A protein has these predicted regions:
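Anion-binding (especially nucleotide phosphate/pyrophosphate-binding) glycine-rich loop
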Residues: 3-137
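Short clusters of hydrophobic/aromatic residues that line enzyme substrate/ligand-binding pockets
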Residues: 19, 25, 31, 92, ...
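Residues in well-ordered beta-strands of folded domains
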Residues: 42, 85, 105-107, 130, ...
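Phosphate/pyrophosphate- and phosphate-bearing ligand-binding catalytic cores of soluble enzymes
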Residues: 20-21, 72, 162-229
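A gly/ser-rich beta-alpha-beta helix-loop segment of oxidoreductase catalytic cores
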Residues: 113-157, 163, 228-229
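Charged, low-complexity, helix/coiled-coil-prone segments
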Residues: 1, 50-62, 152-160, 212-229
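Structural signature of FAD isoalloxazine-binding scaffolds in flavoprotein oxidoreductases
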Residues: 34-35, 41-46, 73-91, 142-172, ...
Length: 231
């Protein structure tokens, strides 16, 4: 398929404001380095990201799902594929309370630290470990992010996941097969669309103190990274 055709189809799904060509990846990674992506698309709702990925698979286009770009190294020559960013999937809210548990809903592009702040402001404990982790919900679920004795596996109830066949399945904590920095998402190259977490009530001052301590300690840790190369 000609370049202009795939770009036009992506614009038809997402609108011109969400599609760009030769987009500098340095603008979308925490390291602030990296050459251009051939095409960059940032769907602003879940239906659009589903339709975008369906199109790319149908047209046999190489693509990469990008969250916050945390610890991602992009080669200077860029990426000769289509980057699909979750950065516009930002819905975050407290869904409900059930007994001593409170449930939080977060779309894939929500920053993990933002979810941790919402939890702390609502005096909800369990998410303190996430306060200093520079990643998105989608990436955090995919790799079962964690630190200082806490991890996503401890608080996630379920995630809406885009499967290889294009269907969307609500996968439970157990079905996600969360293990140390791994999950079924990574094993099968699936896409996290959103997630639901369950947290308990706690003491706000204790929650904030723990988050501050974890954030300070995290600054001294070595950084690992993923390398995205041009093809």
């Amino acid at each position: 398929m000609a370049e202009t055709e795939i770009v036009k189809k992506l614009i038809d799904i997402n609108g011109e404001q969400c599609v760009s060509e030769s987009e500098a990846m340095s603008r979308h990674t925490t390291f602030r380095i990296g050459g251009p992506a051939r095409v960059f698309v940032s769907p602003d709702n879940i239906d659009k990201i589903i339709n975008t990925i369906e199109l790319l698979k149908k047209e046999e286009q190489e693509y990469f799902i990008l969250g916050n770009g945390s610890n991602l190294l992009v080669a200077d020559e860029g990426y000769n594929g289509i980057v699909v960013s979750t950065e516009n999937l930002k819905e975050l809210n407290i869904e409900k309370e059930d007994g001593d548990m409170t449930y939080i809903y977060a779309q894939a592009g929500v920053m993990l630290s933002r979810a941790a702040v919402l939890a702390s402001e609502s005096s909800l404990t369990g998410f303190e470990f996430a306060g200093g982790i520079p990643g998105s919900i989608g990436g955090a679920v995919s790799m079962n992010a964690g630190a200082y004795g806490g991890e996503i596996k401890d608080v996630i109830v379920s995630a809406d996941v885009l499967m290889e066949d294009g269907s969307v399945v609500k996968m439970t904590n157990k079905e996600l097969e969360l293990s140390y920095r791994n999950s079924i998402i990574q094993k099968k190259n699936l896409v996290v669309l959103s997630a639901e977490f369950a947290l308990k009530k706690g003491k706000k001052e204790e929650i904030l103190a723990k988050m501050k301590d974890f954030s300070t300690r995290r600054r001294d840790k070595p950084v690992s990274y993923t390398h995205l190369r041009a093809h």
